[in-house]
């Protein structure tokens, strides 16, 4: 795959040493879901403990919500050992109620969480948030984007959404947010369009407070790429990104469907300013997943090459139902070389 105008990493080696494992499967009792479907992981370390925030349906139906799982305090990041957060009677517990946000996420639910911590100049303090796409009416959208905010004890839902479509090319719906806080700005990559219409454009914006004053909504990647998410992480003196290219049409997915990796000196708002992407997973049918999407990843340290890439998958169940598909969550462990030499991007 070639991205026109992409900058190069002169010494980049091909990824190596890969292994993948299934974490959650609603039809496999050993994964502990008990029939629930939880995917869209956002993985983060909070106070010396690794947490995973997930979107899904605790009973396999109804409006989706955000749930959590964690590793034991002090344990290193791992693909295994995740324990879902449950209530006193064993039920899955959402991370927050709908005390204020139901007007914009009440019936269609909460989708695709993205954890981030950044400075809120309005309050004059650091804010920890879980951004997500909310649907007011229908599970399938249209969507807007808002967040839950940590108050020191619990996650609090917000009465106002933070971001909505306002450009013609967005077609009234924005979702799949991925955020970082860098250089005094909340930077967000997101999907605009609709899966049902097979129209997916990737956008980019930034804001000083993460809820108002967003920059002009800019196209990050065109619709023909079918980019579904773009997750960015700092590493060393540069930034890594892993994204998925999806296939929501009929027939066999084309070879470019799957997960891709690229790097850049800065978290640029144009795909052409990142390195030439390298495919790290294809749409090959592995039984419990094919055509992976919605990845979150972390490295084993700021200069490490070993990355854990959490991703969504699905498989057909064969059930005589209108939607005979089960959604799974997996993890790919892969070595991603640092690479040290970049050509200067055009926007530098």
Please give the residue ranges for each predicted region.
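Carbohydrate-active catalytic/glycan-binding domains of CAZyme proteins
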Residues: 2-348
